[in-house]
């Protein structure tokens, strides 16, 4: 790792800051780009793939940049996190969940616990086995397929729901029957994190993979949040995007793109921060000798790039979808697969 130059640190920091939050896999790009450039850059990936230490020095450096990315997330969503943390502490004191902010706090906890446990147990194994150029290219292609499939499933579900509603309106009048009212999930009319008011009642979703009804973030069930958290563990595979996989899971459970992206970014904050903090002791010890300046430079660039990326993506997902990112992952993954398969 002593061969890491300031140029390499800056480029990798920029790459990390952008791709960590775009649904295109930061780890996959951190493996593929150096391998494509070759030379001393290729050596970084070769060193990573050797797996003969407790952790690859290169991946230790990359994960160390996560602290800067997490700080960017905390700064951008500072008002959200202030509300969520206050709400969480209030529930610990009162032992009741009464507001949308309090519910969101526990949804984040429910989604973070699974990835925390599995990540601690399997991170080293997964990254030693799969953080290689060909594997990263294959998983990047798979990431594109997941994003595209999620968008198509969501669109078909909405179309079916619209067809059923139109058919119901067109049906002739019938003898009225007394039937039970649909179950509702009561929620208080409060401002959710971000300042948006929540609905007073939301129809409870039916079972199944895809929920066709549009739902607000704070109406997710805790088990649904836990499943979304389990989806995050796929991001241990270089090429699978954490933000992409959690957004797809949110879309399938009825969230719109804006709420799915917001929940994804909120979930990413504690996970990315914890991953970075776990690696900081290694960088502060002998393993960091000769590269601490490079880490600082990379972290500064990663933090700035991450903040700008969040700002762009929050606005982007107000009106747009994951489809362009899916196409990018499919094309890039396929080209890289061919490149490294014949190398």
Curated annotation (Swiss-Prot):
Reactions listed under catalytic activity: di-trans,octa-cis-undecaprenyl diphosphate + H2O = di-trans,octa-cis-undecaprenyl phosphate + phosphate + H(+)
Source organism superkingdom: Bacteria
Broad class of the protein's primary localization: membrane
Listed InterPro entries: UppP
Pfam family, one: BacA
Recorded GO CC terms: plasma membrane
Chain segments annotated as transmembrane: 21-41, 57-77, 104-124, 129-149, 225-245, 265-285, 294-314, 322-342
Renumbered residue ranges of the record's region Disordered: 179-202
Annotated GO biological process: cell wall organization; peptidoglycan biosynthetic process; regulation of cell shape; response to antibiotic
Subcellular location: Cell membrane
Residue spans of biased composition, Low complexity class: 179-193
EC number: 3.6.1.27
Family the UniProt entry places it in: Belongs to the UppP family.
Note: Bacitracin is thought to be involved in the inhibition of peptidoglycan synthesis by sequestering undecaprenyl diphosphate, thereby reducing the pool of lipid carrier available.
Function text: Catalyzes the dephosphorylation of undecaprenyl diphosphate (UPP). Confers resistance to bacitracin.
Official protein name in the record: Undecaprenyl-diphosphatase 2
Organism for this UniProt entry: Frankia alni (strain DSM 45986 / CECT 9034 / ACN14a)
Upper classification of the organism: Bacteria, Bacillati, Actinomycetota, Actinomycetes, Frankiales
Gene name of this polypeptide: uppP2
């Amino acid at each position: 790792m002593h061969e890491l130059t300031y140029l390499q640190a800056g480029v990798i920091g920029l790459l990390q800051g952008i791709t960590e939050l775009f649904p295109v896999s930061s780890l996959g790009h951190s493996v593929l780009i150096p391998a494509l450039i070759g030379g001393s850059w290729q050596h970084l990936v070769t060193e990573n793939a050797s797996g003969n230490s407790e952790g690859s020095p290169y991946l230790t450096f990359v994960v160390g940049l996560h602290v800067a990315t997490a700080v960017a997330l905390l700064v951008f969503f500072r008002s959200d996190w202030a509300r969520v943390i206050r709400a969480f502490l209030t529930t610990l004191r009162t032992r009741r969940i009464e507001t949308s902010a309090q519910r969101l706090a526990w949804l984040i906890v429910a989604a973070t616990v699974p990835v925390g446990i599995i990540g601690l147990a399997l991170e080293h194994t997964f990254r030693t086995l799969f953080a290689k150029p060909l594997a990263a290219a294959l998983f990047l292609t798979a990431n594109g397929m997941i994003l595209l499939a999620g968008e198509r499933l969501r669109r078909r579900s909405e179309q079916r729901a619209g067809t059923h509603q139109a058919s119901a309106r067109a049906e002739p009048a019938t003898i009225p029957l007394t039937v039970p009212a649909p179950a509702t999930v009561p929620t208080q009319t409060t401002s959710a994190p971000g300042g948006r008011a929540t609905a007073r009642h939301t129809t409870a979703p039916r079972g199944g993979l895809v929920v066709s009804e549009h739902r607000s973030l704070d109406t997710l069930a805790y088990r649904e949040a836990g499943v979304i958290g389990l989806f995050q563990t796929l991001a241990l595979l270089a090429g699978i995007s954490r933000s992409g996989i959690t957004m797809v899971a949110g879309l399938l459970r009825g969230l719109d793109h804006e709420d799915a992206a917001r929940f994804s970014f909120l979930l990413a904050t504690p996970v990315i921060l914890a991953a970075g903090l776990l690696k900081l002791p290694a960088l502060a010890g002998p393993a960091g000798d000769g590269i601490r300046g490079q880490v600082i430079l990379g972290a500064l660039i990663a933090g700035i790039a991450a903040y700008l990326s969040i700002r762009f993506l929050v606005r982007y997902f107000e009106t747009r979808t994951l489809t362009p990112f899916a196409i990018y992952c499919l094309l890039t993954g396929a080209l890289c697969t061919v490149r490294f398969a014949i190398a």
